[in-house]
Amino acid sequence: MNAEKTSVAPNVDHAEIAKFEAVASRWWDLEGEFKPLHRINPLRLGYIAERSGGLFGKKVLDVGCGGGILAESMAREGATVTGLDMGAEPLQVAKLHALESGIQVDYVQETVEEHAAKHPQQYDVVTCMEMLEHVPDPQSVVHACARLVKPGGQVFFSTINRNGKAWLMAVVGAEYVMKMVPKGTHDVKKFIKPAELLSWVDQTTLKEQHIIGLHYNPLTNTFKLAPGVDVNYMLHTTAKQD
């Protein structure tokens, strides 16, 4: 087993947390700042469920769960879900929405590194969606996710590629032209090239299984999963068997 990196200081960017705390009350507003997350959630959920062989009866961890959009939808599929986030306001919104929806999700305010120290190899599926580009040390998050999943389990990451097209689409287009997300949501310097993410994965017990792009068509106002990872992309990995 390869040595895996562990952070000493909490792997938290408080400015990033503050961005999401400021708009947390509108997390479940289908026409608000998080409309794109609601729009792409069925695609994410379908990809995760299909690549995992279904979610029913599985123990799932959603890292960087925010207000709980993906976490709740996985719980609706019959999974036992834990949602992890360091933002107090988004977690409070998530807890209240789950209560109103009658959906059972265990929400915890804790870093993924802290959670991995307490719960190694506890989860069948670990998801980490659009979170890596919001922390100081994304490599540490990848290593922690690898420690959390059971041997043979599934780990999913999604993030944004770092190149000129991604800057135009995810920052200029999404934040300033289309106004799909609040200005300042993304910092292109924190975007992650697929080769970088795969190199971190290779340092762990995880093995790449599949990578796919998430594409937006402004003419039809639709999202789809398809080949091409030059902007948004999702990575499916599995943990090696003991």
Swiss-Prot record:
Binding site for S-adenosyl-L-methionine: 44, 64, 85, 129
Keywords: Methyltransferase, S-adenosyl-L-methionine, Transferase, Ubiquinone biosynthesis
Entry keyword Cell inner membrane: no
One of the GO biological process terms: methylation
Cited Pfam families: Methyltransf_23
Annotated pathway: Cofactor biosynthesis; ubiquinone biosynthesis
UniProt key word Transferase: yes
E.C. numbers: 2.1.1.222, 2.1.1.64
Superkingdom in the source lineage: Bacteria
Catalysed reactions, as listed in the record: a 3-demethylubiquinol + S-adenosyl-L-methionine = a ubiquinol + S-adenosyl-L-homocysteine + H(+); a 3-(all-trans-polyprenyl)benzene-1,2-diol + S-adenosyl-L-methionine = a 2-methoxy-6-(all-trans-polyprenyl)phenol + S-adenosyl-L-homocysteine + H(+)
Gene Ontology MF terms in the entry: 2-polyprenyl-6-hydroxyphenol methylase activity; 3-demethylubiquinol 3-O-methyltransferase activity; polyprenyldihydroxybenzoate methyltransferase activity
UniProt-listed InterPro entries: SAM-dependent_MTases_sf, UbiG_MeTrfase
Free-text function comment from the UniProt entry: O-methyltransferase that catalyzes the 2 O-methylation steps in the ubiquinone biosynthetic pathway.
Family label: Belongs to the methyltransferase superfamily. UbiG/COQ3 family.
Protein name listed in UniProt: Ubiquinone biosynthesis O-methyltransferase
